[in-house]
């Protein structure tokens, strides 16, 4: 029987691809990008033959229509017997795939596993705009051997009626709640998050794999223009994740025995030291405060306990960055600020947000940093759903004292925590705690409000009053104001 040391999983190879096709008709499909990323990851490991010995291929779900992309990749790469897994659509799922891969390797059920994702969304959209039929013939239906993750966007009828319809609406509301807790004026907070985004663009400008490779000023990010419209106040387009990219990334994980057998140098190997995941969720209405999630705090606290480290031990950090709030909340959960900005890639606006695959890019970037800084520790923080699911991973070239990575799912512990009550169909007075304005291409559409009753129950309301929306977009304060609700419509007093 193999020793536990021989079963120690390590990331052996990584790769990233950015495709900038001058003619979208010549662009490679997502599948071809993923195939090439796995090949490059094997080459990075110094072991090209790894692609012919894959025991499993894990793929986070993308915008593409492949039923079982892992099977198509396995056949192309010469590993036809590889087991296939598709992960759910969620920003935190990549870390969960890494955790499952490590568990498979540690248990002896696999020696070599590839985790890969990719999108050609920019090329696809260019073809659609030009009226050119999509030329990819590889989007074949199928069913993977396994699926991981059951992530749903839960909302109450009151939340839905108020306009809580997607991640943008949730994160913008949470950012306003955070701003209020910090005692900042609306204008000062917009300056703050614009500067955060600006500093992320500086990182992306130096990243060869970034989609937008230029420094963007805070003023350009902050101020709405025809090319940078307001999406959900306080967010302009340059504060939101950019999914219109052509990018792919891959990791190859091996057991210690397999890495040695295939000739992967020790200096290439990077180890998962500890990880936490939190996949259960509660309604937005049930959160005590909108800008803090106890499940995220729990996951962050526990990953330090599992790894016998603290925030001061972290040398390299990348936090999920779909919106400015995600970065701020992730930093707060770890006990960090946002200066220096906790990003290795440049963030999901400027580096790019290839749907569920961004975290593979952040991990590939981290692996390269850790190899260049042996013995250092790096952290990746991920957010899924609408600030609902979380995962953390701590990595190093030093595997630490434990024979296997320490992984814990804190979902059940979180689910047992107390929740705020909410009042469905409420009519009466309440105090505004957060708000946003939904802005369509044609102009302001709807103001959305979260408020608390005198009894502390959360309620939701909306307004289509053009004067009110204009005032909010001009940075007028609404938090703390008394409001009257009736049949979901809110009037500020």
Could you tell me what each predicted segment is?
Residues 378-380:
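Active-site capping/gating regions of soluble enzymes
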Residues 1-87, 102-110, 114-245, 249-251, ...:
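Conserved "HGTGT" condensation-loop signature of ketosynthase/thiolase-family condensing enzymes
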Residues 95-103:
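Conserved phosphate-binding catalytic cores of ATP/NTP-utilizing and phosphoryl-transfer enzymes
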Residues 351, 355-359, 370-371, 375:
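A conserved active-site cap/scaffold subdomain adjacent to cofactor or substrate pockets
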Residues 385-386:
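C-terminal substrate-binding/catalytic lobe of Rossmann-fold NAD(P)-dependent dehydrogenases
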């Amino acid at each position: 029987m193999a020793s536990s040391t021989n079963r120690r999983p390590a990331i052996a190879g990584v790769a990233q691809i950015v495709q900038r096709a001058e003619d979208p008709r010549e662009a490679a499909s997502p599948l071809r990008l993923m195939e090439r990323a796995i090949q490059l990851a094997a080459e990075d490991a110094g072991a090209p033959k790894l692609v012919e010995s894959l025991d499993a291929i894990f793929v986070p779900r993308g915008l593409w229509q492949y039923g079982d992309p892992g099977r198509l990749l396995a056949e192309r790469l010469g590993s036809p017997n590889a087991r296939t897994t598709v992960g759910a659509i969620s920003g935190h799922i990549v870390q969960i795939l890494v955790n499952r891969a490590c568990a498979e390797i540690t248990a002896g059920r696999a020696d070599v596993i590839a985790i890969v994702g990719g999108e050609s969304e920019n090329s696809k959209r260019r073809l659609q705009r030009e009226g050119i039929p999509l030329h990819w013939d590889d989007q074949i239906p199928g069913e993977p051997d396994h699926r991981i993750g059951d992530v749903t966007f839960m909302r109450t009828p009151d939340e839905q009626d108020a306009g809580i319809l997607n991640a943008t609406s949730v994160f913008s509301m949470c950012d306003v709640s955070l701003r209020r807790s910090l005692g900042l004026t609306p204008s000062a907070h917009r300056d703050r998050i614009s500067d955060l985004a600006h500093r992320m663009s500086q990182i992306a400008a130096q990243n060869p794999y970034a989609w937008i490779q230029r420094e963007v000023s805070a003023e350009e990010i902050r101020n709405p223009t025809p090319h940078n419209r307001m999406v959900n106040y306080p967010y302009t387009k340059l504060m939101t994740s950019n999914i219109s990219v052509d990018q792919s990334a891959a990791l190859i994980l091996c057991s210690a025995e397999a890495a040695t057998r295939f000739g992967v140098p020790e200096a290439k190997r990077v180890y998962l030291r500890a990880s936490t995941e939190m996949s259960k969720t509660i309604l937005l209405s049930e959160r005590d405060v909108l800008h803090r999630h106890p499940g995220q705090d729990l996951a962050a606290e526990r990953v330090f306990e599992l790894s016998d480290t603290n925030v001061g031990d972290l040398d390299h950090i990348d936090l999920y960055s779909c919106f400015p709030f995600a970065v701020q909340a992730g930093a707060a959960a770890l006990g960090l600020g946002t200066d220096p900005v906790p990003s290795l890639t440049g963030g999901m606006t400027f580096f790019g947000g290839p749907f569920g695959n961004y975290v593979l890019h952040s991990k590939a970037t981290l692996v390269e940093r850790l190899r260049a800084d042996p013995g250092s520790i790096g952290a990746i923080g991920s957010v899924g759903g609408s600030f609902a699911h979380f995962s953390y991973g701590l990595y190093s070239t030093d595997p630490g004292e434990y024979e296997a990575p320490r992984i814990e799912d804190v979902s059940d512990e979180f689910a047992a925590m107390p929740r705020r009550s909410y009042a469905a169909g409420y009519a009466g007075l309440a105090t505004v705690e957060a708000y946003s304005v939904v802005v369509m291409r044609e102009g302001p559409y709807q103001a959305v409000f979260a408020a608390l009753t005198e009894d502390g129950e959360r309620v939701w309301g909306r307004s289509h009053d053009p004067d009110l929306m204009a005032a909010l977009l001009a940075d007028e304060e609404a938090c703390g104001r008394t409001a009257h609700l009736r049949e979901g419509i809110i009037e500020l007093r």
